[in-house]
């Protein structure tokens, strides 16, 4: 008979059926008892539990309520709360009286099933029968309030518990704390702890740990640090887990000095840091470029016989590799292996990235070969890093070969993969292959993002394919994807370089209607376009508008206007602009100095002007 059928059969069994069963089964049947031993209950299966309950309700006299509670508790641990509730109801129908323990089990199961009103009804019933709720009862109800989004009632219940003389335990506090954090009530969680202290109901280490952990997860390390200090004033000593949690949070939110101070404080108190503490600090110091401090911490860690793990080494290797300190990164890699710590995909990717960033593609490929030989399979990040390295080195054909190798390994390229290849082909002035990769991307079901479109538009414009760029741009505007300021700047620059300054100006003027604020590049592009067309007045008018309500002019703005006036022989206007530029702490750029030098040679300028510029 299936579990479902046995359950239905059991529900249909009436008291009279059970009484008739006495005649056949005898009054003294107690074979169920051995099945209720602690060891048997640990290995009890659900269908066996259903059968066992059936045996128990057919036995005469009925098993004791203690024996029923053992079975109900075992089923509750299986998380079969509905079955516990049903069996509890069946017991009442048969006249088996519940005790406080079984009422607690029932209330807990009802709360777990979000049937809080029924749980409260049972509470009322048990109190009428003279059973006062225990801390277990109230904790179950508290959990029900929290899961039922009735968090204010949960807080009120704890306050009421204290007033009634109950001593909230660790379960009480941690249940409510987790509920408060789930409902984004971090300040209420802190206030709860402080209120309980005032009422003489001191939360323990576990409760403080739960609040501090919640604050850290929410990105509030300052509040966590403040609570840690209050906790220690209350004579509750924090352990390494709490210190490490706060240190890690301080590190993640860039409070590196506070993290180091807390590390020193825990050390002075004799609380031994663990590998997690060290790894958090080392990673943070590496992110700040403080490699010597990070290395010192690693040395300190080794002196204390605290074994670094792969995370510790990865942080240092990644930092050194990015800064071009590749010898140091390789030494750390060798030390990892000497310590029998297996490098993982993150380790290899960091080294490959470092070598690619510093144009050492041969070594990057060697690391790639090594990781494959060690059965550490490369992922999309590995391939993207190598493809980008080859594309930057103008070796886009090698990048495409890597892309094919990636496919052979069953890896699907992502948006970054295709965008990198598109950019690489455009850099090599290979517009056909760039567009081919874009088409393949779409046919492979990989969705281009705005960066992909910007790369495509920029490549087409810079390679003199403005008409094709316009087709893509018009499609983009009709799609659900919103062009950004970079998109408009690319198109504006493409139009101006193609001599279509009026079209560029129309696009610039449309930005405010599209809700896009022009940036300094947008202004500089149009000012440069006007200057190349000989439209100095329009360029200067835009320059004034820029100073009044746009982004402030930068070095590029001034140098573009200075060169335009110099080419027209307007030395006075150029000198005035140079004076203004220098007051803004900008200097002449290479193009301006090149133009001035040429004009000095052919006599259009005297040496005094060079002094003005310098």
Swiss-Prot record:
Transmembrane segments: none annotated. PPR repeats lie at residues 64-98, 99-133, 134-168, 169-203, 204-238, 239-273, 274-308, 309-343, 344-378, 379-413, 414-448, 449-483, 484-518, 519-553, 554-588. Pfam families: PPR, PPR_1, PPR_2. The keyword Transit peptide applies. Keywords: Mitochondrion, Repeat, Transit peptide. GO terms for cellular component: mitochondrion. It is found in: Mitochondrion. Residues 1-7 form a transit peptide. PANTHER family: PENTACOTRIPEPTIDE-REPEAT REGION OF PRORP DOMAIN-CONTAINING PROTEIN, PENTATRICOPEPTIDE REPEAT-CONTAINING PROTEIN 1, MITOCHONDRIAL. InterPro entries: Mito_RNA-Proc/Resp, Pentatricopeptide_rpt, TPR-like_helical_dom_sf. The keyword Transit peptide applies. This is Pentatricopeptide repeat-containing protein At1g63080, mitochondrial. Belongs to the PPR family. P subfamily.
